């Protein structure tokens, strides 16, 4: 989850399951977009979907082949326990729960140990 207007390196790609140009801002998002592209259970997905508050974006909103929605937020492991990260994830989880999405989760980079 990021704030709208995030200023950082952006990789733009065209993926067949993504409704628009897929913009990724870190390696976790990029790799997960590739995984969604190859996942047969995913019909389509959107990247960086703006929330109603006009300030934040969710990393991935996916539509599964059964019509159910799935939301994923990408977080680097080193930021998982930071207060700002926790606050942003709480905002995202509450928002998508209010909109009836039960399949909400995190995508975290691999443990380097």
Q: Where are the regions that the model predicts?
A:
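Electrostatic, structured charged patches in enzyme active sites and in nucleic-acid/phosphate-binding
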Residues: 1-113
């Amino acid at each position: 989850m990021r704030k709208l207007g995030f200023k950082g390196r952006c990789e733009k790609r065209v993926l067949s399951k993504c409704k628009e140009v897929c913009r990724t801002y870190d390696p976790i998002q990029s790799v997960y977009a590739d995984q969604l592209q190859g996942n047969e259970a995913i019909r389509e997905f959107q990247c960086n979907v703006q929330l109603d508050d006009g300030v934040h974006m969710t990393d991935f909103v996916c539509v599964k082949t059964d019509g159910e929605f799935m939301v994923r937020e990408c977080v680097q492991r080193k930021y998982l326990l930071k207060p700002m990260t926790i606050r942003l994830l709480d905002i995202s989880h509450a928002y998508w729960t209010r909109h009836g999405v039960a399949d909400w989760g995190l995508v975290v980079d691999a443990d380097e140990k």
